[in-house]
Swiss-Prot record:
Residues at the catalytic site: 176, 203, 301
Single GO MF descriptor: phosphorelay response regulator activity
Main location: cytoplasm
Lineage of origin: Bacteria, Pseudomonadati, Thermodesulfobacteriota, Desulfuromonadia, Geobacterales
Job description of the protein: Involved in chemotaxis. Part of a chemotaxis signal transduction system that modulates chemotaxis in response to various stimuli. Catalyzes the demethylation of specific methylglutamate residues introduced into the chemoreceptors (methyl-accepting chemotaxis proteins or MCP) by CheR. Also mediates the irreversible deamidation of specific glutamine residues to glutamic acid.
Organism: Geobacter metallireducens (strain ATCC 53774 / DSM 7210 / GS-15)
List of residues that carry 4-aspartylphosphate: 61
Domain note: Contains a C-terminal catalytic domain, and an N-terminal region which modulates catalytic activity.
Compartment(s) where it occurs, according to its Swiss-Prot or TrEMBL record: Cytoplasm
Catalyzed chemical reaction(s): [protein]-L-glutamate 5-O-methyl ester + H2O = L-glutamyl-[protein] + methanol + H(+); L-glutaminyl-[protein] + H2O = L-glutamyl-[protein] + NH4(+)
Protein name: Protein-glutamate methylesterase/protein-glutamine glutaminase 5
UniProt keyword Membrane present: no
Protein backbone atom coordinates (compact mmCIF):
# COMPACT_ATOMS: atom_id res chain seq x y z
CA UNK A 1 0.00 0.00 0.00
CA UNK A 2 1.21 3.51 -0.75
CA UNK A 3 2.21 5.68 2.18
CA UNK A 4 -0.35 8.16 3.45
CA UNK A 5 1.38 11.02 1.63
CA UNK A 6 0.66 9.34 -1.71
CA UNK A 7 -2.36 7.09 -1.51
CA UNK A 8 -5.92 8.13 -2.21
CA UNK A 9 -8.86 8.12 0.17
CA UNK A 10 -10.73 4.85 -0.54
CA UNK A 11 -14.51 5.29 -0.46
CA UNK A 12 -17.38 2.79 -0.62
CA UNK A 13 -20.76 4.16 -1.79
CA UNK A 14 -23.87 2.39 -0.46
CA UNK A 15 -27.25 3.48 -1.85
CA UNK A 16 -30.24 1.66 -3.33
CA UNK A 17 -30.83 4.47 -5.86
CA UNK A 18 -28.83 4.03 -9.05
CA UNK A 19 -29.17 7.78 -9.61
CA UNK A 20 -27.66 8.61 -6.20
CA UNK A 21 -24.87 6.09 -6.67
CA UNK A 22 -24.04 7.73 -9.98
CA UNK A 23 -24.16 11.26 -8.54
CA UNK A 24 -22.02 10.47 -5.51
CA UNK A 25 -19.51 8.47 -7.51
CA UNK A 26 -19.16 11.11 -10.22
CA UNK A 27 -18.64 13.91 -7.69
CA UNK A 28 -16.00 12.02 -5.72
CA UNK A 29 -14.12 10.61 -8.69
CA UNK A 30 -13.56 14.08 -10.10
CA UNK A 31 -11.17 14.66 -7.21
CA UNK A 32 -7.75 13.08 -7.84
CA UNK A 33 -7.24 12.43 -4.12
CA UNK A 34 -10.35 10.22 -3.82
CA UNK A 35 -10.97 6.72 -5.19
CA UNK A 36 -14.43 5.11 -5.18
CA UNK A 37 -13.39 1.49 -4.74
CA UNK A 38 -16.90 0.03 -5.04
CA UNK A 39 -20.63 0.69 -4.86
CA UNK A 40 -23.33 -1.35 -3.12
CA UNK A 41 -27.07 -1.44 -3.81
CA UNK A 42 -28.32 -2.17 -0.28
CA UNK A 43 -27.21 -2.69 3.29
CA UNK A 44 -26.45 -6.39 2.91
CA UNK A 45 -24.11 -5.77 -0.02
CA UNK A 46 -22.70 -2.74 1.79
CA UNK A 47 -21.70 -4.80 4.82
CA UNK A 48 -20.17 -7.51 2.62
CA UNK A 49 -18.07 -5.03 0.66
CA UNK A 50 -17.09 -3.08 3.76
CA UNK A 51 -15.72 -6.24 5.38
CA UNK A 52 -14.02 -7.47 2.22
CA UNK A 53 -12.53 -4.20 0.95
CA UNK A 54 -11.93 -2.27 4.21
CA UNK A 55 -12.55 1.23 2.79
CA UNK A 56 -11.34 4.35 4.57
CA UNK A 57 -14.80 5.90 4.40
CA UNK A 58 -18.36 4.82 3.54
CA UNK A 59 -21.26 6.96 2.34
CA UNK A 60 -24.40 5.18 3.53
CA UNK A 61 -28.03 5.73 2.55
CA UNK A 62 -30.54 5.22 5.35
CA UNK A 63 -33.64 3.75 3.69
CA UNK A 64 -32.72 0.62 1.69
CA UNK A 65 -34.24 -2.82 1.02
CA UNK A 66 -33.07 -6.04 2.71
CA UNK A 67 -31.01 -4.16 5.31
CA UNK A 68 -31.44 -0.48 6.14
CA UNK A 69 -28.51 1.88 6.57
CA UNK A 70 -28.63 2.06 10.36
CA UNK A 71 -28.65 -1.74 10.72
CA UNK A 72 -25.80 -1.98 8.22
CA UNK A 73 -23.89 0.70 10.12
CA UNK A 74 -24.26 -1.18 13.41
CA UNK A 75 -23.01 -4.41 11.82
CA UNK A 76 -20.02 -2.67 10.25
CA UNK A 77 -19.12 -0.91 13.50
CA UNK A 78 -19.27 -4.23 15.36
CA UNK A 79 -17.12 -6.14 12.86
CA UNK A 80 -14.84 -3.59 11.18
CA UNK A 81 -15.23 -0.06 12.59
CA UNK A 82 -15.11 2.42 9.70
CA UNK A 83 -15.84 6.11 9.27
CA UNK A 84 -19.36 6.41 7.86
CA UNK A 85 -21.18 9.44 6.43
CA UNK A 86 -24.95 8.99 6.32
CA UNK A 87 -26.87 10.31 3.30
CA UNK A 88 -30.27 11.35 4.65
CA UNK A 89 -33.47 12.99 3.47
CA UNK A 90 -34.36 16.55 4.51
CA UNK A 91 -37.43 15.54 6.51
CA UNK A 92 -38.32 15.24 10.17
CA UNK A 93 -38.27 11.44 9.84
CA UNK A 94 -34.94 11.63 8.01
CA UNK A 95 -33.53 13.79 10.80
CA UNK A 96 -34.58 11.34 13.51
CA UNK A 97 -33.06 8.41 11.61
CA UNK A 98 -29.88 10.41 11.10
CA UNK A 99 -29.50 11.06 14.82
CA UNK A 100 -30.03 7.33 15.48
CA UNK A 101 -27.19 6.68 13.04
CA UNK A 102 -24.92 9.20 14.76
CA UNK A 103 -25.63 7.49 18.09
CA UNK A 104 -24.69 4.19 16.43
CA UNK A 105 -21.29 5.48 15.32
CA UNK A 106 -21.65 7.48 12.10
CA UNK A 107 -19.35 10.51 12.11
CA UNK A 108 -21.60 12.88 10.16
CA UNK A 109 -24.41 13.15 7.62
CA UNK A 110 -25.09 14.71 4.23
CA UNK A 111 -28.65 15.95 3.57
CA UNK A 112 -29.95 14.42 0.35
CA UNK A 113 -31.41 17.27 -1.69
CA UNK A 114 -30.45 16.96 -5.35
CA UNK A 115 -33.76 16.98 -7.21
CA UNK A 116 -35.32 20.37 -6.43
CA UNK A 117 -33.15 22.81 -8.34
CA UNK A 118 -29.77 23.44 -9.88
CA UNK A 119 -28.77 25.35 -6.74
CA UNK A 120 -29.80 22.44 -4.52
CA UNK A 121 -27.82 20.00 -6.64
CA UNK A 122 -24.78 22.25 -6.51
CA UNK A 123 -25.06 22.63 -2.73
CA UNK A 124 -25.34 18.87 -2.23
CA UNK A 125 -22.29 18.15 -4.37
CA UNK A 126 -20.22 20.82 -2.63
CA UNK A 127 -21.16 19.58 0.84
CA UNK A 128 -20.53 15.96 -0.13
CA UNK A 129 -17.03 16.74 -1.34
CA UNK A 130 -16.29 19.03 1.62
CA UNK A 131 -17.34 16.46 4.20
CA UNK A 132 -15.58 13.56 2.52
CA UNK A 133 -12.39 15.60 2.26
CA UNK A 134 -12.72 16.83 5.82
CA UNK A 135 -13.04 13.26 7.05
CA UNK A 136 -10.08 12.27 4.92
CA UNK A 137 -7.80 14.68 6.77
CA UNK A 138 -8.26 12.76 10.02
CA UNK A 139 -8.06 9.37 8.28
CA UNK A 140 -4.90 9.94 6.25
CA UNK A 141 -3.37 12.59 8.46
CA UNK A 142 -3.02 15.10 5.65
CA UNK A 143 -5.25 17.45 3.63
CA UNK A 144 -6.84 16.01 0.48
CA UNK A 145 -6.25 19.31 -1.28
CA UNK A 146 -3.22 21.41 -1.99
CA UNK A 147 -1.99 22.65 1.37
CA UNK A 148 -3.53 25.96 2.29
CA UNK A 149 -1.62 28.43 4.41
CA UNK A 150 -1.63 27.48 8.08
CA UNK A 151 -3.71 29.60 10.36
CA UNK A 152 -1.64 32.67 11.04
CA UNK A 153 -1.56 33.06 14.80
CA UNK A 154 -2.68 36.64 15.43
CA UNK A 155 -1.61 38.70 18.41
CA UNK A 156 -3.34 37.42 21.49
CA UNK A 157 -6.46 39.50 22.22
CA UNK A 158 -6.31 42.10 24.94
CA UNK A 159 -8.09 40.41 27.81
CA UNK A 160 -10.34 42.20 30.27
CA UNK A 161 -9.65 40.41 33.59
CA UNK A 162 -12.64 39.24 35.59
CA UNK A 163 -12.79 39.72 39.35
CA UNK A 164 -11.66 36.64 41.28
CA UNK A 165 -14.52 34.24 41.92
CA UNK A 166 -16.92 35.91 39.49
CA UNK A 167 -18.86 33.34 37.48
CA UNK A 168 -20.15 33.56 33.94
CA UNK A 169 -23.87 34.13 33.52
CA UNK A 170 -24.27 32.49 30.11
CA UNK A 171 -22.80 29.64 28.06
CA UNK A 172 -22.44 29.53 24.26
CA UNK A 173 -21.52 26.24 22.55
CA UNK A 174 -20.47 25.78 18.91
CA UNK A 175 -19.84 22.57 16.93
CA UNK A 176 -19.97 21.01 13.48
CA UNK A 177 -18.87 17.55 12.28
CA UNK A 178 -19.29 15.13 15.17
CA UNK A 179 -21.17 17.85 17.00
CA UNK A 180 -24.59 16.25 17.50
CA UNK A 181 -23.13 13.46 19.62
CA UNK A 182 -20.55 15.74 21.29
CA UNK A 183 -23.14 18.32 22.35
CA UNK A 184 -25.35 15.56 23.76
CA UNK A 185 -22.40 14.25 25.77
CA UNK A 186 -21.61 17.71 27.17
CA UNK A 187 -25.19 18.67 28.04
CA UNK A 188 -25.81 15.26 29.56
CA UNK A 189 -23.26 16.02 32.27
CA UNK A 190 -24.79 19.35 33.28
CA UNK A 191 -27.44 19.14 36.04
CA UNK A 192 -31.01 20.24 35.44
CA UNK A 193 -30.74 22.95 38.09
CA UNK A 194 -27.89 24.68 36.24
CA UNK A 195 -28.46 28.36 37.05
CA UNK A 196 -27.56 29.87 33.67
CA UNK A 197 -28.85 29.88 30.10
CA UNK A 198 -27.12 27.97 27.29
CA UNK A 199 -27.22 28.62 23.55
CA UNK A 200 -25.97 26.00 21.07
CA UNK A 201 -25.08 26.71 17.43
CA UNK A 202 -24.38 23.62 15.35
CA UNK A 203 -24.14 23.39 11.56
CA UNK A 204 -27.44 21.78 10.58
CA UNK A 205 -30.13 22.26 7.93
CA UNK A 206 -33.46 23.81 8.89
CA UNK A 207 -35.34 20.51 9.00
CA UNK A 208 -32.92 18.98 11.50
CA UNK A 209 -32.55 21.43 14.38
CA UNK A 210 -36.10 21.00 15.71
CA UNK A 211 -35.93 17.18 15.91
CA UNK A 212 -32.41 17.46 17.32
CA UNK A 213 -33.56 19.75 20.12
CA UNK A 214 -36.47 17.41 20.87
CA UNK A 215 -34.06 14.49 21.04
CA UNK A 216 -31.72 16.31 23.41
CA UNK A 217 -34.66 17.23 25.61
CA UNK A 218 -35.35 13.52 26.20
CA UNK A 219 -31.72 12.70 26.97
CA UNK A 220 -30.64 15.59 29.21
CA UNK A 221 -31.70 16.89 32.61
CA UNK A 222 -31.79 20.39 31.16
CA UNK A 223 -34.78 21.66 29.20
CA UNK A 224 -33.84 21.86 25.50
CA UNK A 225 -35.79 23.54 22.70
CA UNK A 226 -35.21 24.98 19.25
CA UNK A 227 -34.77 28.74 19.53
CA UNK A 228 -37.36 31.08 18.04
CA UNK A 229 -37.07 34.82 17.42
CA UNK A 230 -37.79 36.66 20.66
CA UNK A 231 -36.99 33.75 22.98
CA UNK A 232 -35.31 34.84 26.21
CA UNK A 233 -32.17 32.99 27.33
CA UNK A 234 -33.20 31.56 30.71
CA UNK A 235 -31.50 29.58 33.50
CA UNK A 236 -31.54 25.82 33.00
CA UNK A 237 -32.78 26.10 29.41
CA UNK A 238 -30.79 25.21 26.30
CA UNK A 239 -31.72 27.00 23.08
CA UNK A 240 -30.57 25.31 19.86
CA UNK A 241 -30.23 27.92 17.13
CA UNK A 242 -32.41 27.10 14.09
CA UNK A 243 -30.84 25.77 10.91
CA UNK A 244 -30.99 27.57 7.59
CA UNK A 245 -30.38 31.01 9.14
CA UNK A 246 -28.03 32.85 11.47
CA UNK A 247 -28.80 33.73 15.08
CA UNK A 248 -27.78 36.83 17.03
CA UNK A 249 -28.20 37.48 20.74
CA UNK A 250 -29.44 40.95 21.67
CA UNK A 251 -29.92 42.85 24.90
CA UNK A 252 -33.59 43.28 25.77
CA UNK A 253 -33.93 45.25 29.00
CA UNK A 254 -32.36 43.12 31.70
CA UNK A 255 -32.49 39.96 29.57
CA UNK A 256 -30.76 38.48 26.52
CA UNK A 257 -32.98 37.45 23.61
CA UNK A 258 -32.77 35.55 20.32
CA UNK A 259 -32.85 37.34 16.97
CA UNK A 260 -32.87 35.29 13.78
CA UNK A 261 -31.24 36.62 10.63
CA UNK A 262 -31.54 35.61 6.97
CA UNK A 263 -28.30 34.21 5.60
CA UNK A 264 -28.31 36.81 2.80
CA UNK A 265 -27.57 39.52 5.38
CA UNK A 266 -24.21 37.92 6.17
CA UNK A 267 -22.89 36.30 2.98
CA UNK A 268 -19.37 36.19 4.45
CA UNK A 269 -20.34 33.28 6.70
CA UNK A 270 -19.72 29.95 4.96
CA UNK A 271 -21.27 27.84 7.69
CA UNK A 272 -24.92 28.09 8.74
CA UNK A 273 -25.81 28.79 11.49
CA UNK A 274 -22.64 30.79 12.12
CA UNK A 275 -20.95 30.01 15.42
CA UNK A 276 -18.84 33.16 15.05
CA UNK A 277 -21.91 35.40 14.83
CA UNK A 278 -23.68 33.70 17.71
CA UNK A 279 -20.69 34.01 20.06
CA UNK A 280 -19.79 37.56 19.01
CA UNK A 281 -23.29 38.95 19.53
CA UNK A 282 -23.78 36.87 22.68
CA UNK A 283 -20.63 38.35 24.26
CA UNK A 284 -21.82 41.86 23.42
CA UNK A 285 -25.33 41.24 24.72
CA UNK A 286 -24.18 39.95 28.11
CA UNK A 287 -21.24 42.33 28.48
CA UNK A 288 -18.70 39.53 28.40
CA UNK A 289 -20.24 37.35 31.11
CA UNK A 290 -20.05 34.41 28.71
CA UNK A 291 -18.32 31.04 28.74
CA UNK A 292 -17.65 30.01 25.14
CA UNK A 293 -17.19 26.34 24.24
CA UNK A 294 -15.94 24.99 20.91
CA UNK A 295 -16.37 21.30 20.14
CA UNK A 296 -15.42 19.07 17.21
CA UNK A 297 -15.90 20.35 13.65
CA UNK A 298 -14.15 21.11 10.39
CA UNK A 299 -13.09 24.60 9.40
CA UNK A 300 -12.49 27.50 11.76
CA UNK A 301 -16.01 28.74 12.56
CA UNK A 302 -16.05 29.92 16.17
CA UNK A 303 -12.48 31.20 16.32
CA UNK A 304 -13.41 34.84 15.65
CA UNK A 305 -16.30 34.63 18.09
CA UNK A 306 -14.07 33.17 20.81
CA UNK A 307 -11.45 35.84 20.16
CA UNK A 308 -14.09 38.57 20.52
CA UNK A 309 -15.59 37.20 23.72
CA UNK A 310 -12.10 37.02 25.24
CA UNK A 311 -11.67 40.75 24.63
CA UNK A 312 -14.96 41.29 26.47
CA UNK A 313 -13.80 39.34 29.52
CA UNK A 314 -15.36 35.97 28.69
CA UNK A 315 -13.85 32.53 29.28
CA UNK A 316 -13.28 29.65 26.86
CA UNK A 317 -13.16 25.86 26.79
CA UNK A 318 -12.06 23.86 23.73
CA UNK A 319 -12.29 20.12 23.02
CA UNK A 320 -8.97 18.32 22.68
CA UNK A 321 -7.66 16.68 19.51
CA UNK A 322 -7.83 13.10 20.77
CA UNK A 323 -11.60 13.15 21.31
CA UNK A 324 -12.56 15.39 18.35
CA UNK A 325 -14.11 13.68 15.34
CA UNK A 326 -12.66 16.51 13.25
CA UNK A 327 -10.07 18.78 14.88
CA UNK A 328 -10.55 21.86 12.67
CA UNK A 329 -12.61 24.19 14.87
CA UNK A 330 -10.82 23.31 18.13
CA UNK A 331 -7.44 23.55 16.44
CA UNK A 332 -8.17 27.04 15.11
CA UNK A 333 -8.96 28.23 18.63
CA UNK A 334 -5.93 26.57 20.20
CA UNK A 335 -3.47 27.76 17.54
CA UNK A 336 -5.09 31.19 17.61
CA UNK A 337 -4.42 31.54 21.32
CA UNK A 338 -8.02 31.85 22.51
CA UNK A 339 -8.38 28.58 24.43
CA UNK A 340 -8.27 29.01 28.22
CA UNK A 341 -8.84 25.32 28.85
CA UNK A 342 -8.46 22.28 26.55
CA UNK A 343 -10.23 19.13 27.71
CA UNK A 344 -11.38 15.71 26.49
CA UNK A 345 -15.06 15.63 25.60
CA UNK A 346 -16.16 13.69 28.69
CA UNK A 347 -14.80 16.37 31.04
CA UNK A 348 -16.28 19.47 29.38
CA UNK A 349 -19.80 19.30 30.84
CA UNK A 350 -18.41 18.94 34.35
CA UNK A 351 -16.01 21.85 33.77
CA UNK A 352 -18.86 24.07 32.53
CA UNK A 353 -20.81 23.28 35.69
CA UNK A 354 -17.80 24.07 37.87
CA UNK A 355 -16.90 27.36 36.15
CA UNK A 356 -20.36 28.76 35.47
CA UNK A 357 -22.58 26.82 37.82
Amino acid sequence: MLPNQERKLRVLVVDDSSFMRMVIRSVLEKDPAIEVIAVAMDGVEGVEKALALRPDLITMDIEMPRLDGISALKEIMAKAPTRVLMVSTLTCEGAKATFDALDAGAIDYIPKNVTDSIDAQKAFKEELLRKVKGSGISILGRPLVSPSPRLVVPPRPVIIPRPAGQRYQYVGIGASTGGPVAVQEVLGRIPGNFPHGIVVAIHMPKAFTGPYAERLNTKCSLQVKEAKAGDIVQPGVVLVTPGGMHTALVRQGSTVAIRTIATAEYPQYIYIPSVDHMLTTFADACNGSLLGVILTGMGADGFKGMKHLKTKGGGTIVQDEATSTIYGMPRACIEGGVADTVLPLTQIGTEITKIAG
